[in-house]
Amino acid sequence: MKRLLLLGGGYGNMRIMHKLLPNTLPKDYEIILVDEKPFHGLKTEYYALAAGTKSDKEVRMSFPEHERLSYVYGEVSNIDLDKQLVTVGENQVDYDILVIGLGSEDKFHNVPGAKEYSYTIQRMNNARRTLKMTAELPSGSTVGVVGAGLSGIEIASELRESRKDINIKLFDRGERILPDFPARLSKYVERWFIENNVEVIPHSNITKVDQNKLYNNEEAIKVDASIWTAGIQPVEVVRSLDIEKAKSGRIKVNQYHQIPTDEKVYIVGDCADLPFPPTAQTAELQAEQIVDVFKYTWADKELPGTMPSLKVQGMIGSLGSKEGFAYIKETTVTGRIARILKSGVLWMYKLNAK
C-alpha cells in the first residue's frame, strides 16, 4: 500500500482529505495525517477564543473518518527528504507522497522581550493562554495589541466586546489601518475603534517589550499585558529544511505546489511562498490544485503546461459580533452585511467539512 503523508491538520490538508475521500483516492493508497491535536482547529476564529467570546469547542472540528485514513498524533521534529522519513515524537513515518502543511508561528522580529512577555493567538494553545490572561485582568487594566493587521484588528475589537471595562491600545506601524485596501475600508475600521474607545497609535515601532511596558519608538508605555500579532513565519522544523526559501522563511514552490527539486513533496498553506497573504482561503485553493495534480499523476497523464492562477476572492474581517469589513472582488463592504458574510463563510465551511 502506497502512502500519502499529510503533515498538519489545517485548512489545506483538510481540503485535500475531503477532496480525495471517499471515492477519489486510488485503491493502492492510504492517507496518514500527522498533527499535534486530535482535531482540526479553526484558526480564523482563535481571536474569539482568546477574547472569551467563543468557547474552545466552537473553534475546533473532528477530522474525517475513513478505512484508509489514519492518524499519528505528535510534534514533527524532523523531515528527511532524502530518506522520505518524517520523525514524529519517537516514531518515524515513511511516505510515497508528502504534503507539508504545518502552518505558522509568531515572528517576533528579534524585538527584545517580545517572545518572553507577549501573549499570542497564532496557535490554539497560545490562544488558550491568552484567554486565561484576558479573563483574569482586573477592571481598568490596559492591554497593548502590537500589530494592526487582520489578526490585531479582530482581537482588539473582540476583546473590547468581551471586556468593556479595560483599556485597549492598538499599535499600528503604518499611517492608516490596512493600507493595502481602499481608504474607505480603513476609515470605517478606524471610526469603529474611535466609537468603541480603542486607541489606535499609528507610526508605531515597538523596540522592546517588558512585562508591564511597551517601548514605542523608545517611549515607555505602561500596559498590564501585551498581545503580539505583528507577523508570522513557518514553524521551525520547516524553516530548518535545506531547500530554497524566500526571505520570509516560506518554501519556494513551482506552479504545481511542489518543491522544484522533488516532485513527491508538496507545500500547502502558510509554509508556501506565494504572491498572496497566507490565509485559510489561499490554503484551500492550493489544496484543490494539489488534488488536481494528484489526479493527473495517478492517471499517468502529463501535467498541464500552465496551472490556473489561484483566484483569491478577497478578505473578510469582524469587528465584534455585529459589524465587520470586507474587500471582495475589488468591492468594499462594511457594517452588518460584512459580519453576516463572515458568519456565512464559517457556517458553510463547517457544513462542507463534516
Question: Would you name each region that the model predicts?
Answer:
Residues 1-69, 154-180:
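Beta1-alpha1 glycine-rich phosphate/pyrophosphate-binding loop at the start
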Residues 36-41, 47, 51, 101-136, ...:
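Glycine-rich active-site loop/strand segments that organize a redox cofactor
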Residues 286-354:
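C-terminal, flexible cofactor-proximal segment of oxidoreductases
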